[in-house]
Amino acid sequence: MNIHMKRKTIKNLSALENRMLMLDGMPAVRVKTELVESEQGSPNVHNYPDMEAVPLLLNNVKGEPPEDSLPVDHFQTQTEPVDLSINKARTSPTAASSSPVSMTASASSPSSTSTSSSSSSRPASSPTVITSVSSASSSSTVLSPGPLVASASGVGGQQFLHIIHPVPPSSPMNLQSNKLSHVHRIPVVVQSVPVVYTAVRSPGNVNNTIVVPLLEDGRSHGKAQMEPRGLSPRQSKSDSDDDDLPNVTLDSVNETGSTALSIARAVQEVHPSPVSRVRGNRMNNQKFACSISPFSIESTRRQRRSESPDSRKRRIHRCDFEGCNKVYTKSSHLKAHRRTHTGEKPYKCTWEGCTWKFARSDELTRHYRKHTGVKPFKCADCDRSFSRSDHLALHRRRHMLV
């Protein structure tokens, strides 16, 4: 009796190897085993330890896939052992396609491995179907954490235990990585995996940063009350149209010196650079603006008054002729004065028949008005007009004395 059963078992194993429907590396295999009719009532079903000691792994069996609709996944292998005792004699090809269950792959957990290994050693009275289902729509659905799902009905009124294995493309990490490019979308929430919201930073992405009001907003509202006379040069320029700014022309450089110009440039260069980087609420911006603006118009004016003794020596243009101690603040005035010592008169009158020459251009302009009769300076109190501004000033003094 035992020899006959062993021979029959060897035949069943060879038939099972020929009908095993799985390629190496494919994740989904449906196997249904049925009881042999002649051996359903045999009391010696589980008394073969030599057969149970050698489990057959599904990934070691190679065959041709029975269906074209099976999903091909090269990232998952099934390593659960299958109980190949003699009561599971043959595998029907109809059972492989009898009950396809569309289920969602669950997140991987340690309980799935232990449950699958324990299900392989169940009694022979309940046949087992090991499936791994992966669908294209599983990436957009909510994943369920339950590793074992038992169907209520099966073929011939028998229950089938479905062991669900996780599929890598539908894992929550891949779902989040696929949606990282769409920052405004919320990723799929998996019940068994906590979701950590992190800030994704990219060079071209501005929406991820928190926009807070800059110092420019607080400067235009509250800084005028806190510093009414100490506004920065850039703010006073936009409000008062250069009324409070020091003159930085060539004439003012000669009069007030290059130190005031360097201070004004230092105010414009140093002041806005840390201001544009400060972010916070409006009150902090106002306090910070008051603390980081040491240079103001009043401070530059005070420095200009206090620097007069030493700095004016650099701005003074002194005549170097013997016996002449005249001093000018402009180099053009000194050149015109030097012509009085040298006798040079480069400006000639172009009026026909006039041979007058002048050392200064303004003297030539005044002389030329005598020929033309132009009198641009008019008195506001009377109808008289003058060709020279100093003549008009003397005339207006007479009106004031009368």
From Swiss-Prot:
It is found in: Nucleus. GO terms for biological process: negative regulation of transcription by RNA polymerase II; positive regulation of transcription by RNA polymerase II; regulation of DNA-templated transcription. SUPFAM superfamilies: beta-beta-alpha zinc fingers. Its main location: nucleus. The modification N6-methylated lysine is found at K313. A motif (9aaTAD) lies at residues 80-88. Gene3D superfamilies: Classic Zinc Finger. Residues 89-144 have a biased composition (Low complexity). GO terms for cellular component: cytosol; nucleoplasm. Residues 81-144, 219-254 are annotated as: Disordered. The modification Phosphoserine is found at S202. Keywords: DNA-binding, Metal-binding, Methylation, Nucleus, Phosphoprotein, Repeat, Repressor, Transcription, Transcription regulation, Zinc, Zinc-finger. Pfam families: zf-C2H2 (PF00096). A zinc finger (C2H2-type) spans 317-341, 347-371, 377-399. InterPro entries: Znf_C2H2_sf (IPR036236), Znf_C2H2_type (IPR013087). GO terms for molecular function: DNA binding; DNA-binding transcription factor activity; DNA-binding transcription repressor activity, RNA polymerase II-specific; RNA polymerase II cis-regulatory region sequence-specific DNA binding; RNA polymerase II transcription regulatory region sequence-specific DNA binding; zinc ion binding. Coiled coil: none annotated. It comes from the Eukaryota. Transmembrane segments: none annotated. SMART domains: ZnF_C2H2. Confers strong transcriptional repression to the AP-2-alpha gene. Binds to a regulatory element (A32) in the AP-2-alpha gene promoter. Belongs to the Sp1 C2H2-type zinc-finger protein family. The 9aaTAD motif is a transactivation domain present in a large number of yeast and animal transcription factors. In KLF12, the motif is inactive. PANTHER family: KRUEPPEL-LIKE FACTOR 12, KRUEPPEL-LIKE TRANSCRIPTION FACTOR. This is Krueppel-like factor 12. It comes from Mus musculus (Mouse).
